[in-house]
């Protein structure tokens, strides 16, 4: 079951929390299955921060069905677990942010990103930080590249 909060305003954004009730009816699930997701909306643009959600009990698929099309996705669980293709097909994010180094990202996640035409993926390991800025033309991605010194 996927519980959601009522939307509320914060600054110029409208926020809605998803997965707000603990999943207690599945005995063998990890804490990531109880992770919150936040949908942030402003001027018709939609960003989903999917936390550490996993799809062990179908939450990601239900979340995608409840939310529909988004502009950007913070890939859940650091990209270590696959996002079901069914969920990616519903969400259809143009931009994906992965909070992990590329070497740690699941092959299934990489295939999902690469198989979707037009999706751009950014990894925080390649950047000192990633910022999404809302512009009149859409979302702008800013990255601070950290150079690694070699010995």
Where are these regions (language model features)?
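Core dinuclear metal-dependent hydrolase active-site scaffold
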Residues: 3-72, 126-151
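Cap/insert and terminal regions of metallo-dependent hydrolase folds
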Residues: 58-131
């Amino acid at each position: 079951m996927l519980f959601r909060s009522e939307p509320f305003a914060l600054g110029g954004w409208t926020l809605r929390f998803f997965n707000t009730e603990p999943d207690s009816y599945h005995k063998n699930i990890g804490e990531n299955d109880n992770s919150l997701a936040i949908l942030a909306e402003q001027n018709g643009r939609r960003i989903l921060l999917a936390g550490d959600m996993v799809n062990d009990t179908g939450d990601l698929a239900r979340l995608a069905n409840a939310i529909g099309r988004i502009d950007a996705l913070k890939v859940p669980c650091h990209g270590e677990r696959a996002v079901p293709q069914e969920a990616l097909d519903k969400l259809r994010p143009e931009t994906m942010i992965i909070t992990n180094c590329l070497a740690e990202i699941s092959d299934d996640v990489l295939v999902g990103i690469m198989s979707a035409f037009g999706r751009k993926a950014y990894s925080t390991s390649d950047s000192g930080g990633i910022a999404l800025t809302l512009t009149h033309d859409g979302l702008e991605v800013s990255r601070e590249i950290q150079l690694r010194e070699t010995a």
